[in-house]
Amino acid sequence: MFDQIAGGRTDAVFEYLGSGNPVDSTDAAGVSLIRWCAYYGDVSAIKFLLANGESLDALGANFDLNGVSFHGHWQLCQFLIEQGADVNRPLPGTLETPLHAAFCKSDQPVFDLVADVLLAAGADPNSTTAPAVPTGSFMRDCRTKAETPLHRAAAYGGENAIRMLLDAGAAVDARDMNGDSPLSWASWHQRPAHILAMLCFGQHTIHPEAAQQSARERAAGWRGMEKSLAGTPTHGPAMSEPR
């Protein structure tokens, strides 16, 4: 049954514990039940494990909020923040924050929701990574560049996420270790004109008609059902009391 859980059937933790197995069980590689549930973003399964004696500390430092943000689980991000995870705690070495981790994959609207949750909880949109430190955020042979979350969002984020960062005070003219701005990153990654227009500053401009045409073409992209199935974060009293 553990193999089923590790394969994504995290609902099986209820039967697994009901059969008398320990709450801190691990697979052959030492990965625990709660870590598998976090990998798949199953808040209900995690709550069940906690009610049976497991601890969020088993997820690692800061309840692995960076990892959860990286995987796009906004619901679990919100739960972990309610339980005391620090949205501005950087990883040692790279100094990447959860907000940096939310912008490592391209063209996935669920990361807009992760950014929404993190920013609502006070994430700093101008935090910077360390310069030239190897990072696993892009899986292989990559180093940080003293970049802000907006730099990464310029390359990989959606229009909504970029707007949220700007509205939260992200510096559009921030420079990384190479002197590149978010507009530079967007240009390197050949982002569409309406994204480039959001990041222009100083002498840099995009023709309004090009931006409008780009936005019209983009409107035919993400489907309504895809957005609906991702859910909608709400910001009010915490749904879960800290344990």
Give the ranges of each region predicted by the language model.
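Ankyrin-repeat-protein effector appendages
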Residues: M1-D3, A121, A168, W188-R243
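Ankyrin-repeat boundary/"N-cap" motif
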Residues: M1, T26-L33, A58-G67, P90-C104, ...
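N-terminal segments that cap or nucleate solenoid repeat domains
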Residues: M1-W36
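Solenoidal tandem-repeat scaffolds enriched in leucines and small polar residues
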Residues: Q108, A115, A121-D124, P131, ...
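Ankyrin repeat domain, specifically the short helix-to-loop turn at the C-terminus of the second helix
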Residues: F14-P22, K47-S55, Q78-D86, D116-P125, ...
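Ankyrin repeat A-helix N-terminal signature
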Residues: D3-G8, W36-D42, G67-H73, A101-F111, ...
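Ankyrin-repeat and related helical/solenoid repeat scaffolds used for protein-protein interactions
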Residues: E147-C200, T205-I206
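Conserved ankyrin/ankyrin-like repeat signature
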Residues: A12, S44-A45, Q75-L76, V110-V114, ...
